C-alpha cells in the first residue's frame, strides 16, 4: 500500500507535477499562442492596413488625373493666339496664319521668317525674300522640277547631267548609248546615190571662166592663166594657140598638180579630160587667128602635138620678162624657117628634148627670129607643164 501510496503519492505528486506542469505548459502554451496570435494579429492588421492603404492609393491615383493639355498657341513672341479652332497645319507647327506669312517675326529672341516649304522658322540670311522659301529647300525644289532641254540627246543623256550634282560620297553610274545615229529619211533621200565604182566620164566639159577653172595649176597657160604680164596680171592681147581637139591627159595633170583637189578626179578616171569648153571669151581674140595662120594656116587646124609650152631656150635673149606657174620663163616662139608643122612624128609628142636636127635649126634661126612681146606685154603666149616642144625639119 505504501508502495502504492507512495506510488500513488508519487503518482499524485507526479500527477500534481503533471498538472502543475500541464498548467505551466499550458500557460506557456497559452503565452506562446498568445504571442503567436498577437504576432499573427499584428501581421494581419498590417496586411489589412496595407491592403486598405493600397485601395486608398488607387483611389487617390484615380482621383489625381492629369489636367487636359493646353491648347496650341502661336510661338511668336507677343502673339500667343489659341490655335484650337484653326487648321491642323498651324496647330502642328504652332504658328498662326498671320505670322506664317510675315516677312520678319521674333521667335526665341531672333528675327526669323517662317518657310512654307519646309514648315520651319529660318533666319533672314537663309531665306529668299522673293521666292518666300529658304534657299536650300528652294534649290532642291528647282532641281526636282527642272525638266531637261528638248533635243536629240535629251532622251539618251537626260540623266547624265543630274548624276554629276549628287553627293561626293555616293557612287555615280550612267549609261551612254554609242550606237550609230539614225539618219532621217528626208536627209537620206536628199543625198545622191554614189557608188564607189562610179567614175567621172571623160566627156564632162568645164565651162571656162576666171573663177571656175577645173585645173588652174595643171593647164596653166590654156585658160585664164595662159599668160602673165610683168606685174603678174594676164596679158590682154597675147596671141594664143587653141584648138577644139586639144585634150589634157592624166599625165599632164599629174605634172602640174600642186594642191588642187579637182585633179584627183582625173587621176581616178581612165578617160582623158575634155577641156574644149574651158577657154574664156578673150581666148578667141583676133591674135589667135593670126597665130594659127602663122603656125599652120588659117584653114588647117593645128594638131595637138604641135602645141608646146615652157620652152627653155639656151640663150638668155630668148627669155621674156615674166615668169609662169612653174618658175620657168615663158616665151612665144615662131617656127623656124623651113619647118613643116604637119610632118611631126606622133611618137615625139611626149619627149622633153629636141632632136639634133631641130636644135641645129633653132641655133641657125635664133638670131634673126627673136620674138617680141606683143601689145606691150612681157608675157609669153602660153604655158604648159609637159615642157615639150617638138618640131621636125
Curated annotation (Swiss-Prot):
Expressed in young panicles. Zn(2+) 1 binds at residues 74, 79, 96, 99. InterPro entries: SBP-like, SBP_dom, SBP_sf. One of its GO terms (cellular component) is nucleus. Induction: Negatively regulated by microRNAs miR156b and miR156h. Residues 137-148 have a biased composition (Basic residues). One of its GO terms (molecular function) is DNA binding. It is found in: Nucleus. Zn(2+) 2 binds at residues 115, 118, 122, 134. Residues 40-67, 137-158, 273-301, 317-393 are annotated as: Disordered. Gene3D superfamilies: Transcription factor, SBP-box domain (4.10.1100.10). Keywords: DNA-binding, Metal-binding, Nucleus, Transcription, Transcription regulation, Zinc, Zinc-finger. Trans-acting factor that binds specifically to the consensus nucleotide sequence 5'-TNCGTACAA-3'. May be involved in panicle development. PANTHER family: SQUAMOSA PROMOTER-BINDING-LIKE PROTEIN 4 (PTHR31251), SQUAMOSA PROMOTER-BINDING-LIKE PROTEIN 6 (PTHR31251:SF226). The SBP-type zinc finger is required for the binding to DNA. This is Squamosa promoter-binding-like protein 17. The gene is SPL17.
Amino acid at each position: 500500500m505504501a508502495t502504492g501510496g507512495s506510488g500513488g503519492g508519487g503518482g499524485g505528486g507526479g500527477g500534481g507535477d503533471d498538472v502543475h506542469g500541464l498548467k505551466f505548459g499550458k500557460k506557456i502554451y497559452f503565452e506562446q499562442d498568445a504571442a503567436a496570435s498577437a504576432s499573427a494579429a499584428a501581421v494581419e492588421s498590417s496586411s489589412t492596413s496595407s491592403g486598405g492603404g493600397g485601395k486608398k492609393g488607387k483611389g487617390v491615383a484615380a482621383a489625381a488625373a492629369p489636367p487636359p493639355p493646353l491648347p496650341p498657341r502661336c510661338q511668336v513672341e507677343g502673339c500667343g493666339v489659341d490655335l484650337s479652332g484653326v487648321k491642323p497645319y498651324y496647330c502642328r507647327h504652332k504658328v498662326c496664319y498671320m505670322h506664317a506669312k510675315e516677312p520678319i517675326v521674333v521667335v526665341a529672341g531672333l528675327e526669323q521668317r517662317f518657310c512654307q516649304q519646309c514648315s520651319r522658322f529660318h533666319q533672314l540670311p537663309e531665306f529668299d525674300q522673293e521666292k518666300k522659301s529658304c534657299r536650300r529647300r528652294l534649290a532642291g525644289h528647282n532641281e526636282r522640277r527642272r525638266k531637261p532641254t528638248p533635243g536629240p540627246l535629251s532622251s539618251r543623256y537626260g540623266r547624265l547631267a543630274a548624276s554629276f550634282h549628287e553627293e561626293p560620297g555616293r557612287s555615280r553610274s550612267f549609261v551612254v548609248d554609242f550606237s550609230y545615229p539614225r539618219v532621217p529619211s528626208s536627209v537620206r533621200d536628199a543625198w545622191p546615190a554614189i557608188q564607189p565604182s562610179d567614175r567621172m566620164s571623160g566627156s564632162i566639159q568645164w565651162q571656162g571662166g576666171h573663177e571656175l577653172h577645173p585645173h588652174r595649176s595643171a593647164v596653166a597657160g590654156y585658160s585664164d592663166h595662159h599668160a602673165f604680164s610683168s606685174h603678174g596680171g594676164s596679158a590682154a592681147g597675147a596671141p594664143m594657140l587653141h584648138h577644139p581637139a586639144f585634150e589634157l591627159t592624166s599625165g599632164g595633170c599629174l605634172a602640174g598638180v600642186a594642191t588642187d583637189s579637182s585633179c584627183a578626179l582625173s587621176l581616178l578616171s581612165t578617160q582623158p579630160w575634155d577641156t574644149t569648153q574651158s577657154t574664156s571669151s578673150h581666148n578667141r581674140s583676133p591674135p589667135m587667128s593670126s597665130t594659127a595662120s602663122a603656125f599652120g594656116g588659117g584653114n588647117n587646124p593645128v594638131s595637138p602635138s604641135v602645141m608646146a609650152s615652157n620652152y627653155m631656150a639656151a640663150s638668155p635673149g630668148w627669155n621674156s620678162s615674166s615668169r609662169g606657174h612653174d618658175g620657168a620663163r615663158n616665151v612665144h616662139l615662131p617656127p623656124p624657117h623651113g619647118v613643116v608643122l604637119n610632118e611631126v612624128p606622133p611618137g615625139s609628142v611626149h619627149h622633153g628634148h629636141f632632136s639634133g636636127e631641130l636644135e641645129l635649126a633653132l641655133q641657125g634661126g635664133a638670131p634673126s627670129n627673136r620674138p617680141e612681146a606683143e601689145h606691150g606685154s612681157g608675157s609669153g603666149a602660153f604655158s604648159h607643164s609637159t615642157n615639150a616642144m617638138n618640131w621636125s625639119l
